[in-house]
C-alpha cells in the first residue's frame, strides 16, 4: 500500500495568497527555509494502478499534474482515480470536485450522511455536479469497515472525530458524529495500517485506540499553539475552537504522539501557514525532530 501526500497545508495553502505572516512573507522573500505547500489531500493505492483520492482541494489540478502515477494515459480521457473519499464538508476539502467535472462517468464518491447533507444544501456542490459528470454516492459507515470497488489491496474503516462542522453548516459549533471522520487504511496483504486524521480536535478513546493500532499516523498538524491565530491577529478563535488539537502545551498532539509505540511512524499534515514548524530552521521544527515526528510535504510517499 502506498499513500501519496498530494497537499500538506491547511486551507489557503502556503504561502496563503493574502497573508504576510512571518512564514508567508519569509517564503516569498527567500528569508525562511521552507517548502511551498498546497491544500490538504492524499491518494492511496494497493496495486500502483487504482487509486482513491481523499478530499478534493482547490489545488487538485496542480496536485494531479505533479502526480504522474494518477494519469496513466491509457485512453484519450483517462485517470487512475477510481473513487473519492471526503472526510468532511470543509471548503478546502471539497471545492476541487468542481475542477473534476469533466469525468466521462459519475465519480464514485464516499462520504458520511452529514457531509452529504451539507454538500446538498448549505454548499450544494453535489447538485451542481449533477449537471456535469454526476456522482455515484456511497455512504461511509461509522462502524465497521468498507471496501471500494476497483481498488484491490486496501481496506477502509472510518471513525467519528470531535472537530467542527463547516462555517456554512447549520451544525457549526454543534457537530454531530460524521461531520468529521478519521480513516484507518489497511494493506490487506501485510496487515499494516495507516491512520489518517487531518482534522482532530479531541483525543477520544476510540481515536487513541486506532492510533495505537496503526503502523503510521498521518494526523492534524494545523497549529503549534492553541492561541497562535489570536496572537498573530489572524483570528479570534483558538485552535481547539476551530476543531484542531494544537501540537504544543498540555494535552497537545506532541504529548499524545510521544505515547505511541517507538515503532510507529508519526507524520503531521494539514499545516497552517502560520505554524512555525514550516520553517525548517525553527526551534519548533527541531523539537518535532527530537520527538521523532515528521512534517508532511507535497509529493511525500508513505509505503506500508
From Swiss-Prot:
CDD domains with a match to the protein in the record: PQQB-like_MBL-fold (cd16274)
Superkingdom of the organism of origin: Bacteria
Pfam families linked to this entry: Lactamase_B_2
GO BP: pyrroloquinoline quinone biosynthetic process
Transmembrane segments annotated in the record for this chain: none
HAMAP family the record matches: PQQ_syn_PqqB (MF_00653)
UniProt protein name: Coenzyme PQQ synthesis protein B
Organism encoding this protein: Azoarcus sp. (strain BH72)
Amino acid at each position: 500500500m502506498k499513500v501519496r501526500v498530494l497537499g500538506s497545508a491547511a486551507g489557503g495553502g502556503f504561502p496563503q495568497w493574502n497573508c504576510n505572516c512571518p512564514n508567508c512573507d519569509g517564503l516569498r522573500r527567500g528569508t525562511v527555509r521552507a517548502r511551498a505547500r498546497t491544500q490538504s489531500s492524499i491518494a492511496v493505492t494497493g496495486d500502483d494502478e487504482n487509486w482513491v483520492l481523499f478530499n478534493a482541494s482547490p489545488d487538485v489540478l496542480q496536485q494531479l499534474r505533479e502526480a504522474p502515477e494518477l494519469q496513466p494515459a491509457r485512453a484519450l480521457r483517462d485517470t487512475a482515480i477510481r473513487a473519492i473519499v471526503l472526510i468532511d464538508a470543509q471548503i478546502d476539502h471539497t471545492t476541487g470536485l468542481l475542477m473534476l467535472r469533466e469525468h466521462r462517468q459519475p465519480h464514485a464518491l464516499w462520504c458520511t450522511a452529514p457531509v452529504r447533507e451539507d454538500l446538498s444544501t448549505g454548499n450544494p456542490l453535489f447538485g451542481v455536479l449533477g449537471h456535469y459528470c454526476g456522482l455515484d454516492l456511497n455512504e461511509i459507515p461509522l462502524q465497521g469497515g468498507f471496501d471500494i470497488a476497483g481498488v484491490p489491496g486496501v481496506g477502509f474503516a472510518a471513525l467519528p472525530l470531535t472537530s467542527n462542522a463547516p462555517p456554512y453548516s447549520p451544525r457549526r459549533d454543534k457537530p454531530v458524529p460524521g461531520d468529521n471522520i478519521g480513516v484507518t487504511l489497511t494493506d490487506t496483504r501485510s496487515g499494516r495500517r495507516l491512520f489518517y486524521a487531518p482534522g482532530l480536535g479531541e483525543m477520544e478513546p476510540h481515536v487513541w485506540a486506532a492510533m495505537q493500532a496503526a503502523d503510521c499516523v498521518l494526523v492534524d498538524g494545523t497549529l503549534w499553539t492553541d492561541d497562535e491565530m489570536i496572537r498573530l491577529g489572524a483570528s479570534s478563535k483558538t485552535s481547539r475552537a476551530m476543531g484542531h488539537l494544537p501540537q504544543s502545551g498540555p494535552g497537545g498532539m506532541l504529548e499524545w504522539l510521544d505515547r505511541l509505540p517507538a515503532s510507529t511512524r508519526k507524520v503531521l499534515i494539514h499545516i497552517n501557514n502560520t505554524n512555525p514548524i514550516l520553517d525548517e530552521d525553527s526551534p519548533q521544527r527541531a523539537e518535532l525532530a527530537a520527538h521523532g515526528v515528521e512534517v508532511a510535504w507535497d509529493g511525500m510517499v508513505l509505503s506500508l
